[in-house]
């Protein structure tokens, strides 16, 4: 891939663009795994895929030197570069961009970086692996987010990615933005979580995500603490509601829903409403005709709420809107149903 095919985005531009269209395919929260690296003497390469923002502990030292929240290698590397290999969390994905974050690395940051990817559905990379360049070798400055959008999206699916830094140094976080390529069962009657990220579900819009990101709603598992759910700011005006829109991984018939308030004990929503729509748009417009599939229901703290036999389940849907009343936090949203024939 050439430099001309890469556009650098500001953090604000990136959050707006990728926030509506992509997920971080290598996030540990989505199942990403670091398989190996050339060296991580000063700071572990495992830190690269931590979904949390990097932090600083000024003045804190460990056995190898100053503590850093990221990946840091030895000085004086005699090889052309240091590298790390990461396996995507989902079965495979299409890549739309990437981020190399050097926050708090200043004077020990990686001077240059590049990214390559491979499709290996049956195994892991070895010395014979044919890597495809997706980010050309580019300068990498200190303590900043380097975020790139690919103007022409590679048409291959990828399962693994390799980040190289030249010749050595430190990087806080590595994000690989893109879309999950789902693998569906042949049986259309198979019961699926149509909203799950592994099946291509995507949170495309929300009213607010002050304390917890909207994308957390569709992650696997039930999370580890209150920080890995979706949580909005406290509302002060009468009649306020918050909402989130999910684009399903496949158009389908919605039978049941699960709304999990795990870890939200004093800040869960009072009530929830679910609406759905069959729309060709990525994000349904302001005049979209949503239909209710779950009228207002009370929620409780720190528990899974299962709602069965939802309304309008004979109509195929593409999107679900969850409305929480008046505000609060939800850990996970599951939308169970069956794929439509088309």
UniProtKB/Swiss-Prot annotation:
SUPFAM superfamilies: Galactose-binding domain-like (SSF49785). Its EC number is 3.5.3.4. It catalyses: allantoate + H2O = (S)-ureidoglycolate + urea. Pathway: Nitrogen metabolism; (S)-allantoin degradation; (S)-ureidoglycolate from allantoate (aminidohydrolase route): step 1/1. GO terms for molecular function: allantoicase activity. Keywords: Hydrolase, Purine metabolism. GO terms for cellular component: cytosol; nucleus. It comes from the Eukaryota. One of its GO terms (biological process) is allantoin catabolic process. InterPro entries: Allantoicase, Allantoicase_dom, Galactose-bd-like_sf. The keyword Hydrolase applies. PANTHER family: ALLANTOICASE (PTHR12045), INACTIVE ALLANTOICASE-RELATED (PTHR12045:SF3). Utilization of purines as secondary nitrogen sources, when primary sources are limiting. NCBIfam families: allantoicase. HAMAP family: Allantoicase. Belongs to the allantoicase family. This is Probable allantoicase.
């Amino acid at each position: 891939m050439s430099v001309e095919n890469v556009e650098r985005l500001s953090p604000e531009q990136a959050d707006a663009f990728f926030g509506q269209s992509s997920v971080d395919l290598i996030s540990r929260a989505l199942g990403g795994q670091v398989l190996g690296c050339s060296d991580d003497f000063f700071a572990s390469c495992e830190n690269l895929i931590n979904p949390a923002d990097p932090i600083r502990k000024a003045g804190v030292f460990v056995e190898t030197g100053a503590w850093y929240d990221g990946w840091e290698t030895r000085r004086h590397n005699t090889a052309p570069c240091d590298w790390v290999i990461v396996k995507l969390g989902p079965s495979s994905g299409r890549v739309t961009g990437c981020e190399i974050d050097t926050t708090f690395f200043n004077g020990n940051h990686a001077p240059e970086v590049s990214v390559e990817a491979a499709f290996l559905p049956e195994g892991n990379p070895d010395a014979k692996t044919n890597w495809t360049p997706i980010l050309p070798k580019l300068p990498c400055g200190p303590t900043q987010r380097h975020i790139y959008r690919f103007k022409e999206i590679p048409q291959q699916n990828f399962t693994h990615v390799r980040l190289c830094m030249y010749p050595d140094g430190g990087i806080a976080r590595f994000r690989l933005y893109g879309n999950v390529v789902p693998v569906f069962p042949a049986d259309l009657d198979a019961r699926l979580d149509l909203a799950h990220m592994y099946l291509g579900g995507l949170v495309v819009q929300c009213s607010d995500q002050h304390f917890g990101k909207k994308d957390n709603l569709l992650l696997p598992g039930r999370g580890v603490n209150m920080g890995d759910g979706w949580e909005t700011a406290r509302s002060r005006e009468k009649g306020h509601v918050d909402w989130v829109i999910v684009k399903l991984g496949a158009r389908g018939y919605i039978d049941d829903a699960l709304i999990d308030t795990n870890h939200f004990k004093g800040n869960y929503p009072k009530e929830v409403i679910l609406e759905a729509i069959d729309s060709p748009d990525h994000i349904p417009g302001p005049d979209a005709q949503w239909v209710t599939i779950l009228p207002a229901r009370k929620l409780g703290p720190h528990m899974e709420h299962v709602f069965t036999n939802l309304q309008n389940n004979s109509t195929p849907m593409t999107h679900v809107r969850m409305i929480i009343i008046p505000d609060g936090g939800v850990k996970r949203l599951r939308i169970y149903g069956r794929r439509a024939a088309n």
